[in-house]
Each structure stands twice: as structure tokens, then as C-alpha cells.
Amino acid sequence: MKQTKLTGRIVVPSDPGYDIARINLNLSIPKLPCIIVFCQNKNDVCNALKWAREHHVPFRLRSGRHSYENFSLLNHGLIIDVSEMKKITVNTRNLTATIEAGANLGTVYKKLWKYGVTIPAGTSASVGIVGLTLGGGIGMLSRLFGLTCDQLVEVEIVQACGKFGAKIIRASEQENSNLFWACRGGGGGGNFGIVTSLTFRVHPIQNVSIFSLTWEWKDFIAAFQAWQNWAPYIDERLTSSIELFPKQRNKIEVKGEFVGSPSELYPLLSPLLETGNPSLFIDEVPYIKAVQFFNSGNIPEKFKRSGSYVYKPIPLKGIQIMQYFLSHAPNKDASIWHQSLVGAVENISPNETAYFHRKAIIAQEYITSWKCDVEENRNIR
């Protein structure tokens, strides 16, 4: 049998660019793959999968390098990287966009903005579109339009077939519908194949209103209670987050986006404005400027992140536990972040897609990072 050759841009440990090619966003879990293939098209993906099967080489899939636990890396194996496949095609008549698997959110937002449309997706520009979508995908338009995966029309995916083969298939409501169900929130990492492109419904967008409110540490409990009793239930055009910072930073911050004018937004903020004495920022901007406002500008670092879904308002004791932790945080870079949900997210039943948490009112994430290895235990214990 004729053996398959790897195609695409191939990087091995002896190449000068190997160290840059192998690292992910999280530097605390380094891995040393033996080959990294930067696929240029879906045929390169097929060849990489065939090669791995023929040579019995373990492999991982990678796009945006945002796997928190570096599940997209491995030692002594093959990385099938699709990050250089970035083509985006917009159909303005049907209001759809077909996006190759390597595009990150920054690239997607900029391209779609040229056509006056967008998809509801995340806030970090460097996140890959595929990993986000397969996990569900939340962001500042979630309560108005739903999850990123809710906009999916079709998935193009490479799957293993036969003893050593690979094939390109499509999944939609009409074709391979069970696979399409699984791809909408069933998780990233290649659970069901290697996604090479996604087709989404897109939404017209123009100007939006952005805002932030900031309290001092003394208002920790009152500010969080006010936000969590307001954010999941307010006008669906408004999605917001609250980030709780360590005591040494003396800051609690709410940020949000409203698809409407500042004059409509201001009265909606009353429950927050009446809590303590927050500073307020409001502006009406083109949507692409709002994307920049929320982008956290992630850079590679050593970190640990985990999260949970909240189905009922967190009781006072729970808020006090968060306050206690952040008053004893290992450094100033720890935080607890929350985003409001429900709205359009719950318009789809939990069984209609693989994303189950339709009734969750809040997504919660625990964040910490460190500079030196000796600080690791204090940050992740």
C-alpha cells in the first residue's frame, strides 16, 4: 500500500521556528510534539490524519491555541494545526458566512463588519472560531441572538474511515443530523472529527452602546448582589459581565453591550447606579469598536482557569466565600468573572443541541496567573 505523505507547512524540533510553533496560550503545561503540520487546506488535514493512522502516531488538533489545559498539545506526537486556514466567504443574500477553521474571532469580526453583519461570539480576539463554537460560544450578544453554535447551518469535517483512511463529510439539519447535533455544544478537541469549515447565519449590526461601572472593594457584596439579580433578567438586548478583583486592586467592574441607544440604556442601569457610588462610562460606537472595547488582549502566560454555570442567584454565603478568597488572593492577577445568560440562550431546549446549560443564568470563570514556577501551587490549590 502506498503510504501517505504529510503536506502543508511542516515544523519539526530541529527547525528554528519550533519553539514558537509548539507553544499555546498557557505556558504552564509545556509539551514537545515531534511534528507540527500547519494545514493550508482540507486535503492537508486528510493527509495528516491518514499519516497518523498509517504510522500509529498519536495526534492532537489545534486552531486558536486557547485550550486552558493544553489538550491541543502532546509529547512525541503529531499536531494537526488548522490556524493557517482562514478564508471567510459572506453571502449577503442568504445572510450566511462560511468560515475556515483557522480563523480567530478578531479576523471573523473584522471580515463580517465589512458587510455590516456579525455572529454572537466571544470577546477575546485570539480565540479560534471552531473551539468556541463546538463548546457553545458565549459573548456580548448572547442574550439577544443566542450562542455561537445556535447560528450554525453546516459543518465541514474530516473523519477517519476504513483501516487508515480519511474522508470529508458535511453535517447539517438535513445531512448527518446526529453529528450536527453533537457539533453544537458537544465540545471541542476533535471529539467527532476535524472541522475544516463552519457555515453560520449572520445578523445585521450597526451601532451599539457600551458601558462600564466600577465600584471600590467596600461595595463588593452589594455590587455583586445588584448585578446578579439584574443582569440575567433585564432587556435581552443587554448582555453584561462582572469581574471581581483582589482586594489589593480595590475594584469591582461591570462591562456590557446594549443593542440600542445610550438614552435607552441609561434607565436600564438604574439598579446598578443606585448601588453604592460607582463610576460610569457609556458610549455609542460602531459595533467593531465595541469588539475592541471587550477584547482582553490575551498573551501567553502561566495560568489556571476553571468555570461553572450558575442556575440560581448565588446566596450571601457564596458571595462572602468569593470575597474571602479574593481578599487572600496569591497575587493581583487573580479574579472571578461572570457573564449574564438566559435571554435567547434559553429559547432552545436543552435537548435540541448538545449544549445542555440553557437555563443557566450566569457563566462563571475563576482566573489566576503567575510569573514564577514557585508561585504555581499557591495559585492552583
Regions found by a protein language model. Give the residues of each.
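Soluble FAD-dependent oxygen oxidases
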Residues: 1-381
